Amino acid sequence: MKKKRVLTGDRPTGKLHLGHWIGSIMNRLQLQNDSRYDCFFIIADLHTLTTKTRKEEILQIDNHIYDVLADWLSVGIDPEKSAIYLQSAIPEIYELNLIFSMLTPLNHIMGIPSIKEMARNASLNEESLSHGLIGYPVLQSADILLAKAHLVPVGKDNEAHVELTRDIAKTFNRLYGEVFPEPDILQGELTALVGTNGQGKMSKSANNAIYLSDDAKTVQEKIRKLYTDPNRIHATTPGRVEGNPLFIYHDLFNPHKEEVEEFKTRYRQGCIRDVEVKARLAEEINLFLNPFREKRSELVAQPKFLEEALQQGTEKMRTVARETMEEVHDHLGLSRKWRTILASSK
């Protein structure tokens, strides 16, 4: 049976954190190791430009790409099983994005909730939204359809992006002939992990993240400062467990479930100090992160391996991209005669 192609990835904005692990990485590892799927993982550096256009920000992207590569491979993304590629190294993406932009009504894009969220996160008002930021869902559609992905793992907040991609595929296929599969949403990406400050999801920009590469001392310090129940002034004050980051993290990263339930009971009764519960959490998170940190140290010491992993996956995607665009041009028919003449004169 032919494998279904899966496309997912990250913008290279820095090191990955526990929120990435919970929100996407666990699911990606399951997909990679499932023989029914052929996984393509994109490092979406072009998407970084939607909110980061200052020269100093752009120059940081090279290092961030190394960070993403090192983090992916340290947690088990395998370049022998999956294609890891760099978005900007695939020139066909630019071309397909332009073609799709001609087929996509603006009101379809502006109805996507994440456009406004990205603008808020970048402190942009409506008047200062760039053409690229408004159009980035179309660029995402080009990423997905160029790879001819059948499945796209996303959370609830990004389902509208895949729906737009399906609409674009339908429009192209109806106007010019069948080229693109209509990708399905693959449920499995989990709810965002709350940040260490208890305010919104864990993210680099909010400075509330525990990184997969944080050393043990850093993890201990971040857990020591972890937001808990603000109404619990003393250890003898009964505390709230529900929605408390301290116990959200314990539920996710402490495998000793009986211990966690005992902590919850004593916390509700005011019979245990925050510092005790936090100390155990820090121990378990460090145990969880140890193999990733060790593997990452090995990978960082051999950058050539990281470069070859990216080169290998990018070459695979280039082959797919060329084949897809040949079909696009055949069906679109744009300047077909002259393209043939110019190609034969080389």
UniProtKB/Swiss-Prot annotation:
Q: What's in the keyword line of the UniProt record?
A: Aminoacyl-tRNA synthetase, ATP-binding, Cytoplasm, Ligase, Nucleotide-binding, Protein biosynthesis
The record lists ATP as bound by R11, P12, T13, G19, H20, G155, K156, D157, L193, K201, M202, S203, K204, S205
What is the annotated localization of this protein? Cytoplasm
Q: Name one GO molecular function term.
A: ATP binding
The cross-references to Pfam families, in alphabetical order and at most eight, read: tRNA-synt_1b
Identify the EC number(s).
6.1.1.2
Q: Where is this motif: 'KMSKS' region?
A: 201-205
Q: Does the keyword Secreted apply?
A: no
Positions occupied by motif 'HIGH' region: 12-20
Q: Mainly localized where?
A: cytoplasm
Residues at which L-tryptophan binds: D143
Q: What are the BP-aspect GO terms?
A: tryptophanyl-tRNA aminoacylation
Domain of life, source organism: Bacteria
Instruction: Give the catalytic activity.
Output: tRNA(Trp) + L-tryptophan + ATP = L-tryptophyl-tRNA(Trp) + AMP + diphosphate + H(+)
Q: Which Gene3D superfamilies match?
A: HUPs, Tyrosyl-Transfer RNA Synthetase
Offer a single GO CC term for the protein: cytoplasm
Disulfide pattern: none
Q: Which family does it belong to?
A: Belongs to the class-I aminoacyl-tRNA synthetase family.
Self-association and partners:
Homodimer.
- What's this protein's function? Catalyzes the attachment of tryptophan to tRNA(Trp).
The record's listing under HAMAP family reads: Trp_tRNA_synth_B
Query: Would you tell me the protein name for this molecule?
Result: Tryptophan--tRNA ligase
Report which gene this protein is encoded by: trpS
